[in-house]
Amino acid sequence: MTRLSDVVKVDSKGRITIPQAVREALGVEPGMLMALIADFDKREIIVSPIVTKPEAVYEFDLNLVDKPGSLAAVTGVLAKHKADIITSKCTSIARGEEASCTIIVDMSLSDVDADTIKRELEELEVVIQVRLRKFETRY
């Protein structure tokens, strides 16, 4: 795994500049959409490039039973329907009891719509709650 780390400054409008070496390595172009996941508990932000049309991108926000195989069951449903995971962030809320996952998915090649996948996820015994949101550009 190749990594590059850097310290960047936030400007007065809340923007950061992604270093050129990172933009080139990840293929980030001007005008490209980026998925942003903020974890308030860990005080961290994950930024991932989106290489598909924004109308095909959805966010699944799930609460799961925190046990081995829970995440595999969720990703199995996504894979079965050819929903491509762009980025994901999962954390244990209460170890051995509950976990939270945010999964951003490209639905452009999926054989079903996002609501169908949401219903299938809700039927899994390891899923406590599923919230679905269409990823929208804001700027």
Predicted regions and their residues:
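Regulatory modules associated with amino-acid/nitrogen control
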Residues: 1-60, 70-75, 130-139
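A conserved regulatory-domain signal marking ACT and ACT-like small-molecule sensing domains
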Residues: 50-139
